[in-house]
Amino acid sequence: MRKLTLLFGLLLTLGSLHAQEKGQFVLQAEANAGILFCYPYQGAFNSIDLEGAVGPVLRYQVGDRLEIGIGANYCAHHAFQYLPIFADAKYCFGIEKSRPYAELRAGYAFPLKYAKSENGNPNWYSVEGFFSQLILGYSISHSDIGIGGQLVNMKEYSTEWPDILPGGCLTFTHNQLKPAVFLRYAYNFHFGK
């Protein structure tokens, strides 16, 4: 009975929290951990790899449920690194502090480290170009927990003239969109008008 009373009190407390106000700025600090699919530099089409990302997002609350802004993430993979800069829109379903949300991002990923093929061919790879994410999750007070999907553009470069130039010359060969799934935790700092 005592646990039931505590649970009921907790639910009443969460339900009585005030909604966020229109006109606020929200600074979000986030960390992602996920799995990247289909990276060809390992020589297997269905290879998967772990990836992590951290970064800030700055949003403006334009209504009780909608926030828009910009952000950047530092994404690290064991073979390469990249920095996406993106526009962000977050829509919350409800006006309570505890509510589900959907978030959409689109932007450009800048390569920070290239990866050499591990299957013996002389090609190099980078994540560079188109970047997008869709995140579905739940906000509890200042914290967001979510699961997301991501599409990034992977560029492949072939090594030309390795006998003439030391290390050869990299020549762009083609683009491929690569998917990923990830879990995200974020903490939101709210600033008044």
Model-derived features: where do they sit?
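Positively charged n-region of N-terminal signal peptides that target proteins for export
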Residues: 1-4, 20
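Short glycine/proline- and aromatic-enriched beta-strand/turn motifs that initiate or cap beta-hairpins
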Residues: 19-60, 180, 184-193
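Feature marks short, surface-exposed loop/turn motifs that line or immediately flank catalytic pockets
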Residues: 35-37, 76, 108-112, 151-155
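Gram-negative (and chloroplast) outer-membrane scaffold detector with strong preference
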Residues: 55-118, 126-135, 140-142, 178-193
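Sec-dependent N-terminal signal peptides
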Residues: 4-14
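Outer-membrane beta-barrel translocator domains and adjoining extracellular loop/strand segments
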Residues: 39-47, 80-85, 113-121, 157-164
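Outer-membrane beta-barrel proteins, especially TonB-dependent receptors
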Residues: 157-184
